[in-house]
Regions:
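Active-site loop of classical SDR/Rossmann-like NAD(P)-dependent oxidoreductases
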Residues: 11, 223, 247-268, 281
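N-terminal Rossmann NAD(P)H-binding glycine-rich loop of SDR-like oxidoreductase domains
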Residues: 1-22
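Rossmann-fold cofactor-recognition segment
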Residues: 32-42
Length: 297
């Protein structure tokens, strides 16, 4: 069977490809990775490439992820909604016409962060900015067009050894700077792309599940906590030579174009129950990803 991966050059796409060969899924599916050569905003182009590959499952990891960039101007907003809203709709339309299954990646940014307990899949959405609104548009399109043959996976605070993310940026700044200031009033759960990849493989191979699932590593922390842990683990692994002072600041002291949710914790109970999986502690996952970075260096 054939599986198409969109967004193959993103951090999740790279992780999926890196783990593919050693995973049991590779014995059942042939992977077709697509990045910019597959324009998900152009249905005709998408149809030609996917039909030629005989695809029966799609993992849509393609996304416009510039949270602040999406707020800059009308063109940025248009691009965000084209990639994050129209793109998933096109994939769902093609999947419906061809009998394929679609697994679509989404985000905690569909929520406004005003909750006081972990968000469940059925909780009301209320995105605070363009990025979250565009991702919600994609969710709604997929659910409407392909209600029984789609899975939407919301993940929070995604990071990996690849590309640009909080972990990689923090490690770089800890080498370049004498001190760091990180917000302490935004709370959530990190998600390593490695753990998320295992969950996605589980969804594909089980051939069950539909609707929305939440997935993250286990534990609740602030961005400040995450930065402090990155420094500790980075020093242990030899990626950092010394520690630097890390200041704990409020969101108000670090203004950005886009408003971030203050609380982004996701309830993963449904994912754990339906797919018999247990999410791993975030610190354990962080240690593994840092080890991967050390091995690459």
């Amino acid at each position: 069977m054939q599986l198409a991966l969109t967004g193959a050059n993103g951090q999740l796409g790279k992780t999926i490809q890196q783990q593919w060969a050693s995973a049991p899924i590779s014995e059942r599916y042939e992977l077709h990775p697509f990045d910019k050569q597959l324009d998900i905003t152009d249905f005709a182009s998408l149809e030609n490439k996917l039909s030629a590959s005989g695809v029966s499952v799609i993992i849509n990891a393609a996304a416009y992820t510039e949270v602040d960039g999406a707020e800059q101007d009308a063109e940025a907003r248009r691009l965000a909604f084209a990639v994050n809203g129209d793109g998933p709709a096109n994939l769902a339309l093609w999947a419906k016409s061809s009998g394929a299954r679609l697994i679509h990646l989404s985000t905690d940014f569909v929520f406004d962060g005003t909750a006081s307990s972990p968000y469940r899949e059925q909780d009301a959405t209320n995105p605070l900015g363009v990025y979250g609104a565009s991702k919600l548009a994609g969710e709604l399109a997929v659910a409407k067009i392909l209600p029984s043959d789609s899975v939407i996976v919301r993940a929070s605070w995604l990071y990996s050894q690849y590309n640009k993310n909080f972990l990689k940026t923090t490690l770089r700044l800890m080498v370049e700077k004498d001190s760091l200031a990180v917000v302490n009033d935004q709370t959530g759960s990190p998600t390593s792309t490695s753990a998320l990849t295992h969950f996605l493989f589980n969804i594909v191979c089980s051939e069950k599940g539909n609707g929305i699932y939440h997935f993250s590593d286990k534990g609740v922390i602030s961005w400040y906590d995450f930065a402090a842990a990155i420094q500790e683990e980075g020093i242990k692994a030899g990626l950092l030579e010394k520690s630097i002072p890390i200041s704990s600041i409020s969101t108000a002291q670090y203004p950005t174009l886009a408003t971030r949710p203050a609380y982004s914790v996701l309830d993963c109970t449904r994912a754990e129950a339906d797919f018999a999986c247990t999410t791993a502690p975030w610190r354990e996952q962080l240690r593994q990803v840092i080890q991967c970075i050390q091995d690459r260096d």
